[in-house]
From Swiss-Prot:
This is Ribosomal RNA small subunit methyltransferase G. It is an enzyme of class 2 (transferase). GO terms for cellular component: cytosol. The gene is rsmG. HAMAP family: 16SrRNA_methyltr_G. Its EC number is 2.1.1.-. It comes from Streptococcus agalactiae serotype Ia (strain ATCC 27591 / A909 / CDC SS700).
Amino acid sequence: MTPQAFYQVLIEHGITLTDKQKKQFETYFRLLVEWNEKINLTAITDKEEVYLKHFYDSIAPILQGYIDNSPLSILDIGAGAGFPSIPMKILYPEIDITIIDSLNKRINFLNILANELELSGVHFFHGRAEDFGQDRVFRAKFDIVTARAVARMQVLAELTIPFLKVNGRLIALKAAAAEEELISAEKALKTLFSQVTVNKNYKLPNGDDRNITIVSKKKETPNKYPRKAGTPNKKPL
């Protein structure tokens, strides 16, 4: 997907990028490739592939109408090089973005990226989701939590749901259909007073399969969750 094709798809969805926004995406691509030589950020470095499989893929929740340009508080868990939240922030500057990542080198990259892109309303924290999820500064404070190819839902739910306000949403982006995964996650979702409201398969413009799953938080999370770092993965609910 060329940058021009990317812009055109957005126009078809009623979003016309300003010159500043186009430049932000160009700068994002440049910094991603530059920094990828120092630290492992992505296996995808070809420009057209980055625009398709990182930028376009990241804004799927916007293109499908699940996120609008309002002062939403969004937490991105395990964002790595900033996906999906930074492309969404470029598109919709009104949203407030927080990223938690377990690798400090990636946090350093994100700080430089945000500075170069002149983004405000972005916050980056180094650490484990399990630890932050028990911190009252972060717990039950977000409208939306996003996670792109982070973990299977049985694990992901415990890592993310505690951060949400009641009626907040987890938006999980994955490369494949999620039906079996969601069956395995039924107990975890019930334990965390949450339920699946959207499970949608779709395709990227090149035909690659993708899935978006949205989970809504119905009641406050029991205090014992999330359990200590590493436990959700070793002993899923």
